[in-house]
A protein has these predicted regions:
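N-terminal auxiliary segments of SAM/dcSAM-dependent transferases
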Residues: 1-14
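Class I SAM-dependent methyltransferase SAM/SAH-binding core
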Residues: 59-61, 67-120
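A conserved beta-strand element that flanks and buttresses the S-adenosyl-L-methionine
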Residues: 132
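A short, conserved alpha-helix within the catalytic core of class I
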Residues: 140-151
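Conserved beta-strand signature within the Rossmann-like core of class I S-adenosyl-L-methionine
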Residues: 156-165
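C-terminal alpha-helical "lid/dimerization" subdomain adjacent to the S-adenosyl-L-methionine
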Residues: 165-210, 216-218
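Core SAM-dependent methyltransferase catalytic element
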Residues: 216-240
């Protein structure tokens, strides 16, 4: 897999029935918990939190939230450590947000759901401390990744965390195997998502193209990587 696949995933172009959408996000939630995807994102926030004050309110925008697993995990993680973490869970898909809302329970107090495009956010720039996403960038073209990183940079005053798959043959084989017992959407999109994923050097190069050389790549268990960092001398949000 020397190059990324440009084949479109089924869920990029179609909206399956709600029960299929729910099954997809339930599967992804389990994979993230069991194979370290959630831990990879929380590890980067753990590093950032060394500079936070006890009880500090921290605003996070979780882009392409899907089933909301990462948004809920961030709220729980923050509260467990004495921080007031508030997460705006953003997705362009209404069916994804329906699935996320159905799965929100005690975490709802720290969550706010918004159905919108990250490039057309109904808020001013710099309103969030951090912008995060998971399993989003492999859906995008290289040029769209650059544009999206620049949007993240405009929205976040402190930092960015991007979590995604690493393109490897071994990961492709595991994805093919794990999705066999599930629905046709997962059997198609799961392995394809690995073929569409980046290698670490490719994603780092796109960050440089976006003018965000302060973002660094880290590899994690479960064939995951994060592209993340905090801006030196955190930018202040513009006055309203």
């Amino acid at each position: 897999m020397s190059q990324r696949s440009l084949e479109r995933e089924f869920m990029d172009d179609h909206t399956p029935p709600q029960d299929v959408v729910d099954d997809v996000y339930q599967f992804l939630g389990r994979i993230n918990r069991w194979l370290g995807g959630t831990r990879a994102t929380l590890h980067r926030f753990e590093e950032f939190s060394r500079g936070w004050r006890a009880g500090q309110r921290v605003e996070v925008l979780d882009v392409a939230t899907g089933g909301g697993d990462f948004a809920r995990a961030l709220v729980r993680w923050g509260h467990a450590r004495g921080f007031d973490v508030r997460v705006t869970a953003l997705d362009i898909s209404a069916s994804a947000l329906r699935s996320a809302r159905q799965r929100s329970t005690s975490d709802a107090a720290g969550l706010h759901y918004v159905c919108a495009d990250v490039h057309r956010m109904p808020c001013r720039e710099g309103v969030f401390d951090y912008v995060s996403c998971s399993l989003f960038f492999h859906h995008l073209t290289d040029d769209d990744v650059v544009r999206t990183l620049q949007s993240f940079d405009a929205l976040a005053t402190r930092g960015i965390v991007v979590n995604d798959l690493v393109r490897r043959w071994r990961h492709y084989a595991w994805s093919w195997l794990f999705t066999r017992p599930f629905n046709a959407v997962l059997r198609h999109d799961g392995p394809l998502s690995v073929r569409r994923a980046f290698r670490p050097t490719e994603l780092a190069a796109l960050a440089r193209r976006a003018g965000l050389s302060w973002l660094t790549i880290r590899l994690h268990f479960g064939h995951r990587m994060t592209l993340a960092g905090e801006r030196q001398g955190h930018r202040r949000a513009p006055s309203s």
